[in-house]
Amino acid sequence: MSLDISQFPVLAQANTPNELRQLPQALLPQVADELREFLLKSVGISSGHFASGLGTVELTVALHYVYNTPFDRLIWDVGHQAYPHKILTGRRDKMHTIRQKDGLHPFPWREESEYDTFSVGHSGTSISAALAMAIAAEKEQAGRKVVAVIGDGAMTGGMVFEAMNHAGDLHNDMLVVLNDNEMSISENVGALNNHLAQLMSGRFYTTLREGGKKVLKGMPVIKEMAKRTEEHLKGMVVPGTLFEELGFNYIGPIDGHDVDALVETMRNMRNLKGPQVLHIMTKKGRGYEPAEKDPIGWHAVPKFDPSLFKKPATKPGLPTFSQVFGKWLCDIAEQDEKVLAITPAMREGSGMVEFSQRFPKQYFDAAIAEQHAVTLAAGFACEGFKPVVAIYSTFLQRAYDQLIHDVALQQLPVLFAIDRGGIVGADGPTHQGAFDLSFMRCIPNMVIMAPSDENECRQMLYTGYCYDAGPSAVRYPRGSATGAMQVEAMTALPIGKGVIKRVGKRIAILNFGTLLASALTAAESLDATVVDMRFVKPLDVDLVKEMAQTHEVLVTVEENAIMGGAGAGVLEQLQKLRMPKAVLQIGLPDEFIKHGSPEEVTHDLQLDAEGILAQINAYLAQ
């Protein structure tokens, strides 16, 4: 259900940036107010990322007003904050479909709009992409401008500083907008600082500054004195020294909710030479009191009624796998103070809130710095501690070298609790946990476990905790557990051993992970044997051999890419044993999995019970 645009009379006149730029500047505050109200009601209908977008309304209006998008390139980092951008770039009438099957993509996506100049989803990529586009713009000589928008949270990633260091060295024309959305507006944001930013970005100041540099080039002592004087004057009101040292001209901070100040400052900065940083201060959840008070809790929301000023109550139900992990972590920390938990800015999502509160000295949030988080764990292991890295499958990709070089190569006992393994759903291809089994399986010294239910997950986490011969990983999906009876006592499982769950004939289904219930349902119609393999690596070779000897067809089932996954490991072992056998591999196809609800995606990929049965029957009919 789309919103009635007649309720937003000024916004109705700005369905595209070209239309926005036709409006008088005096109307921009009203555009921003109506855009915020539209976003509020739209996300209430569709669900989605919420607080970040409310904080970037004025910024988005100013950017599209000053810059000639899409000719000028605008790159958003991550994209959580880009909903207002989508609304202003011709997608207003489809906002109610965002994150839904066949609807708008959850993040800026090149295939969706010419205004989305770079597809995003993971943090820290915007400045590298913007630098490349700035270099290309200089080669084209067409007058194209390039802007990257990045949040303060993403500034903790090493890739950001690698890009800024390179940009400062090359000195191409580009603007980086640092959206600093801390919980409150900084004290030095206000009329004085806005005026200072406009003054320092103005033509007179910059001409004087650049001309002075040329004059002082032959007088190094006076040049150094002038430089220090300028830095001292700026340093009294601005925290830009770091960016200046990296080769950027720094302007700000200014109030990111003052659309007129943003427009005037950007107009001044638009034609400045070299790399520029505009530091703006915004408030997550701006304009909606519950989100302002709890921006983390309102980061992403289900469908809700904004007029109630609260999210819908969650229905009591099964715990999530993240909660199962969080409880296990607290239980084990009660027994062992050497357990140290590390997460790259995923405390809430990984189920670690209680642990962080109860065991603050054993909890480390490495921020959005996955490479650092993994090597930090390696260092802890060297010193005799028991590090546990809680990380999403899609983000572990970003620390692959550290996993190999710093952990596995040294056979360090680091436990990886890999959340969001398999189909994640609405966040789409940038967040599906499709590849972890494949990219870990080829690493020597790794033990990889895939639990079929919450009790097995708990026991596998304990198994990894006890395993000291090298790194281990337990990967589990997003969402609710299966309802299995949890055994509070923790027992280490025998490494590399699976269990037979159902005895049948002719067909043996070798299941890896939480698709076990669907495999068992499909097996009833086929009278097939079902095995809970438990371990992807080391594989239970004896059990695979037994199944191959006693069945005509083997079927492997996993919620991971078929290429290089657990099923590929079964085929490799059969070849090694010189046992030719008909094997059907069921899993994720060789494509990036689109967004939709987990249930929709699972059904479309034929990974539910009905689909597994259909795939097996089709294979048998060949």
From Swiss-Prot:
Recorded superkingdom: Bacteria
CC cofactor: Mg(2+); thiamine diphosphate
Catalytically driven reaction(s): D-glyceraldehyde 3-phosphate + pyruvate + H(+) = 1-deoxy-D-xylulose 5-phosphate + CO2
SMART domains recorded: Transket_pyr (SM00861)
Manner of cofactor binding, per the entry note: Binds 1 Mg(2+) ion per subunit. Binds 1 thiamine pyrophosphate per subunit.
Biochemical pathway: Metabolic intermediate biosynthesis; 1-deoxy-D-xylulose 5-phosphate biosynthesis; 1-deoxy-D-xylulose 5-phosphate from D-glyceraldehyde 3-phosphate and pyruvate: step 1/1
Cellular component, GO annotation: cytosol
EC number: 2.2.1.7
Name of the protein this chain belongs to: 1-deoxy-D-xylulose-5-phosphate synthase
Gene name per UniProt: dxs
